[in-house]
């Protein structure tokens, strides 16, 4: 799916693109391969572990934060329009491959489930401290 997703962007070599879910960097690496020296790629991730995958390339800018702030961050960089946006929503496979984040069903670990460690509320607090009705309502809303 990586190549198909990037192909769907119909990349212009001098274009400006955004990967709003950087994660392991696979999509961003493929986008960079299609850009000329004048093309630019901005990527977002709120998971600090994603920064271990940062690309060392003058055309690439990794922004720590949620893509909901895309307009503000791009404006800061002088960008008012982009040629394409890629979003691969969901949990990163690296978050499933370890028990330490609380997403894995294969490994024991804390019930955390935060996309960013900077978030103050983790899943354990919700399960153990919220009233049953609130947790039930949250679960039902997620499955509508």
Language-model segments: which ranges?
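A general structural motif
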Residues: 12-14, 38, 80-82
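Short amphipathic alpha-helical segments
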Residues: 55-56, 75, 97-100
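Conserved alpha-helix/loop element of class I SAM-dependent methyltransferases that forms part
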Residues: 1-13
């Amino acid at each position: 799916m990586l190549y198909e997703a990037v192909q769907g962007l119909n990349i212009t070599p001098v274009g400006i693109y955004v990967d709003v879910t950087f994660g392991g960097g696979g999509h961003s690496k493929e986008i960079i391969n299609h850009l000329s020296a004048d093309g630019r790629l901005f990527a977002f991730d709120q998971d600090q572990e994603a920064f271990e995958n940062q690309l060392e390339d003058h055309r690439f800018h990794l922004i720590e934060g949620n893509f909901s702030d895309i307009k503000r961050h791009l404006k800061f960089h002088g960008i008012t329009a982009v040629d394409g946006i890629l979003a691969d929503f969901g949990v990163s496979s690296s978050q499933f491959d370890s028990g330490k984040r609380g997403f894995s069903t294969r490994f024991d670990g804390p019930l955390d489930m935060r996309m960013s460690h900077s978030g103050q509320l983790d899943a354990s607090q919700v399960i153990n401290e919220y009233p049953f009705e609130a947790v039930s309502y949250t679960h039902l809303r997620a499955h509508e």
